[in-house]
């Protein structure tokens, strides 16, 4: 399957994406990760107001194949979580780069985004 990643997205090695949205950062998991998981049946996300730290687990995704932890690509405080994905995990399955986003955070250090892979580098990584 050929994957397409938006140019403004930045990616962690663990397949989470992040991108700046004004002064905030939107976080989700890549289309590649969703494809690898298969049918997603449950998503667990922390409450709004929770602090997350880069590289630490912030929730999990359960599919018919496995339960996988998700890791914060940047540090910050959760200002919004996508409750639609919690109620209907298929939104993550159907549109991981759009309506299936997971969290919006207020980043502690927006420069952490530059430490992540750009779309081209990520595409090469998953193709190797």
Swiss-Prot record:
InterPro entries reported in the protein's UniProt record: 2-oxoA_DH_lipoyl-BS, Biotin_lipoyl, GCV_H, GCV_H/Fam206, GCV_H_sub, Single_hybrid_motif
- What Pfam families has UniProt attached to this entry? GCV_H
Which residues are annotated as modified residue N6-lipoyllysine in the UniProt record?
A: 65
Q: How is the cofactor bound?
A: Binds 1 lipoyl cofactor covalently.
Cite the entry's keywords alphabetically: Lipoyl
Q: Domain Lipoyl-binding: where?
A: 24-106
CC terms in the record's Gene Ontology section: cytosol; glycine cleavage complex
Output one GO BP term. glycine decarboxylation via glycine cleavage system
Q: Which PANTHER family match?
A: GLYCINE CLEAVAGE SYSTEM H PROTEIN (PTHR11715), GLYCINE CLEAVAGE SYSTEM H PROTEIN-RELATED (PTHR11715:SF3)
HAMAP family xref list: GcvH
NCBIfam families according to UniProt? gcvH, PRK01202.1
Subunit structure, interactors included: The glycine cleavage system is composed of four proteins: P, T, L and H.
Indicate the family of this protein. Answer: Belongs to the GcvH family.
Q: What is this protein called?
A: Glycine cleavage system H protein
**Species:** Prochlorococcus marinus (strain NATL1A)
Whichever gene encodes this chain, its name is gcvH
């Amino acid at each position: 399957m050929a994957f397409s990643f938006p140019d403004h997205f930045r990616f962690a090695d663990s397949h989470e994406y992040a991108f700046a949205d004004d002064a905030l950062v939107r976080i989700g998991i890549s289309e590649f990760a969703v494809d690898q998981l298969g049918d997603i049946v449950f998503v667990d996300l922390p409450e709004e107001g929770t602090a997350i730290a880069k590289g630490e687990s912030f929730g999990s995704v359960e599919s018919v194949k496995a339960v996988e932890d998700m890791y914060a690509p940047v540090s910050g405080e959760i200002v919004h979580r996508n409750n639609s994905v919690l109620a209907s995990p298929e939104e993550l399955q159907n549109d991981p780069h759009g309506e299936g986003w997971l969290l919006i955070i207020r980043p502690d250090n927006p420069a952490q985004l530059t430490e992540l892979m750009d779309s081209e580098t990520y595409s090469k990584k998953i193709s190797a």
